[in-house]
């Protein structure tokens, strides 16, 4: 079970949004690279990064900050937000990124995801962001008619490295993970699932360490880490003991 600390980038700064609303951004660190190094020093083994501006623009906007993060940490980094073409994917992987996360393009052009998986095996993840059980796109600004499991099943056997599943209604508000929908997704597909949105406390961490959660590859934590609701050393100890 991997605990992924999150760095969400807006205007070059490390922020957290409430319910995916760009107008409700809380700045946690003006130096994302320093934050990445701090997470590494705390013992985390991966880093989850999202270019929030890029998710709305459809192309990389916080590229300078991402490059600084890649230079600051030795940990593998996965990046989402504005990655829409094979050229975007190749560009970031060539710069040292371990894994790209494809969200909007997975809905708009599933064939591109499958092509990317063939071209870059093990380095392509799909981000499924849901609101009211339906997949949202374009930086969560638009709702589609697709159901979460319906979309996920399109990529069975394609070589997708992981599905990052975010419940938008719980993101950034410390409401707790949507356990039911997350586990339902993990049970419906063979692709590893990473839970995102709502992780709020050490109680959530202890639940992640239970046998029923072994279907998950990991979980992403943002605000709970920044606000001190989750102690990094204790959380990592609990999850490693359950491995």
From Swiss-Prot:
Key word Cytoplasm present: yes
Keyword field: Amino-acid biosynthesis, Cytoplasm, Histidine biosynthesis, Isomerase
Any single Gene Ontology cellular-component annotation: cytoplasm
Reactions that this protein is recorded to catalyse: 1-(5-phospho-beta-D-ribosyl)-5-[(5-phospho-beta-D-ribosylamino)methylideneamino]imidazole-4-carboxamide = 5-[(5-phospho-1-deoxy-D-ribulos-1-ylimino)methylamino]-1-(5-phospho-beta-D-ribosyl)imidazole-4-carboxamide
CDD domains named in the record: HisA
Active site: 8 (proton acceptor), 129 (proton donor)
Keyword Amino-acid biosynthesis: yes
Protein EC: 5.3.1.16
Enzyme class, first EC level, given as a word: isomerase
GO molecular function: 1-(5-phosphoribosyl)-5-[(5-phosphoribosylamino)methylideneamino]imidazole-4-carboxamide isomerase activity
Compartments reported by the entry: Cytoplasm
Disulfide-bonded cysteines: none
Pathway info: Amino-acid biosynthesis; L-histidine biosynthesis; L-histidine from 5-phospho-alpha-D-ribose 1-diphosphate: step 4/9
Pfam families in the cross-refs: His_biosynth (PF00977)
Family: Belongs to the HisA/HisF family.
HAMAP family, alphabetized: HisA
Protein name per Swiss-Prot or TrEMBL: 1-(5-phosphoribosyl)-5-[(5-phosphoribosylamino)methylideneamino] imidazole-4-carboxamide isomerase
């Amino acid at each position: 079970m991997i605990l992924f600390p999150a760095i969400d980038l807006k205007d070059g700064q490390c922020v957290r949004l409430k319910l995916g609303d760009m107008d409700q951004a809380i700045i946690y660190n003006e130096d994302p690279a320093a934050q990445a190094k701090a997470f590494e020093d705390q013992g985390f083994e991966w880093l989850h990064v999202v270019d929030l501006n890029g998710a709305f623009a459809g192309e990389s906007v916080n590229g300078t900050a991402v490059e600084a993060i890649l230079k600051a940490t030795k940990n593998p980094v996965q990046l989402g937000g504005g990655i829409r073409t094979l050229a975007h994917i190749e560009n970031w992987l060539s710069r040292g990124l371990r894994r790209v996360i494809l969200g909007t393009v997975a809905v708009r052009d599933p064939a591109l995801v499958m092509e990317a998986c063939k071209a870059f095996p093990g380095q392509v993840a799909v981000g499924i962001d849901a609101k009211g059980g339906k997949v949202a796109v374009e930086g969560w600004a638009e709702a589609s008619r697709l159901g979460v499991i319906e979309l996920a099943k399109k990529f069975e056997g394609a070589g997708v490295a992981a599905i990052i599943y975010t419940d938008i209604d719980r993101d950034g508000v410390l409401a707790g993970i949507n356990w039911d929908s997350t586990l339902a997704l993990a049970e419906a597909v063979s692709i590893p699932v990473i839970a995102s949105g709502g992780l709020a406390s050490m109680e959530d961490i202890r639940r992640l360490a239970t046998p029923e959660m072994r279907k998950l590859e990991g979980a992403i934590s943002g605000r709970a880490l920044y606000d001190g609701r989750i102690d990094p050393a204790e959380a990592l100890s609990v999850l490693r003991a359950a491995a």
